[in-house]
């Protein structure tokens, strides 16, 4: 009998309206968690990278004004940072800007200077479709399974 009373008392406390609310008074009964963002990378480095990306976008829009269809889809900062020398970076950038009718020398030199202050982001390598020797240039990677 005492066990029944104890059980009823515990059950009534669990079902009481004050217990139905979680900590912080949320009616859902779920604990309210403090949102905490952890960043693996240094915030300053990320801001520098973002600033360079915005600068690149602005310069490309200016260089390709009126000929946006010729503008490169992307100037991959990490790909440029992976190259061993500044000469290789320069050639890569000039290759991306082949279709540009406006002079690009100043842009290339400024971009090289900005790249000197950046570091490659660690992460998982994302191979491009051109890195896969089993695919010919005309094959669509999404619709073709490797042999």
Swiss-Prot record:
Give the UniProt subcellular location, in the record's own words.
Cytoplasm
For bias type Basic and acidic residues, the affected ranges are 138-147
Stored SUPFAM superfamilies: Myosin phosphatase inhibitor 17kDa protein, CPI-17
Q: Which residues carry this modification: Phosphoserine?
A: 26, 128, 134, 136
GO biological processes: cellular response to xenobiotic stimulus
Q: What is its main location?
A: cytoplasm
Q: Which UniProt keywords apply?
A: Cytoplasm, Phosphoprotein, Protein phosphatase inhibitor
May I have one GO cellular component term? Answer: cytoplasm
Phosphothreonine PTM sites in chain numbering: 38
Q: What does this protein do?
A: Inhibitor of PPP1CA. Has over 1000-fold higher inhibitory activity when phosphorylated, creating a molecular switch for regulating the phosphorylation status of PPP1CA substrates and smooth muscle contraction.
Family as reported in the entry's similarity comment: Belongs to the PP1 inhibitor family.
PANTHER family the record matches: PROTEIN PHOSPHATASE 1 INHIBITOR POTENTIATED BY PROTEIN KINASE C, PROTEIN PHOSPHATASE 1 REGULATORY SUBUNIT 14A
Which protein is depicted? Protein phosphatase 1 regulatory subunit 14A
Specify the species.
Mus musculus (Mouse)
């Amino acid at each position: 009998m005492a066990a029944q009373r104890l059980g009823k008392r515990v059950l009534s406390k669990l079902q009481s309206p004050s217990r139905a609310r979680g900590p912080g008074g949320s009616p859902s009964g779920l604990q309210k968690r403090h949102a905490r963002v952890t960043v693996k990378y240094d915030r300053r480095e990320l801001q520098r990278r973002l600033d360079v990306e915005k600068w690149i976008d602005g310069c490309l829009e200016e260089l390709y004004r009126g000929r946006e269809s010729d503008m490169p889809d992307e100037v991959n900062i990490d790909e440029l940072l992976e190259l061993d020398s500044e000469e290789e970076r320069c050639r890569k950038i000039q290759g991306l800007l082949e279709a540009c009718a406006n002079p690009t020398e100043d842009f290339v030199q400024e971009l090289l200077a900005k790249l000197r202050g950046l570091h490659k982001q660690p992460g998982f390598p994302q191979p491009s479709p051109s890195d896969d020797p089993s695919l010919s240039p005309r094959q669509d990677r999404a619709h073709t399974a490797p042999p």
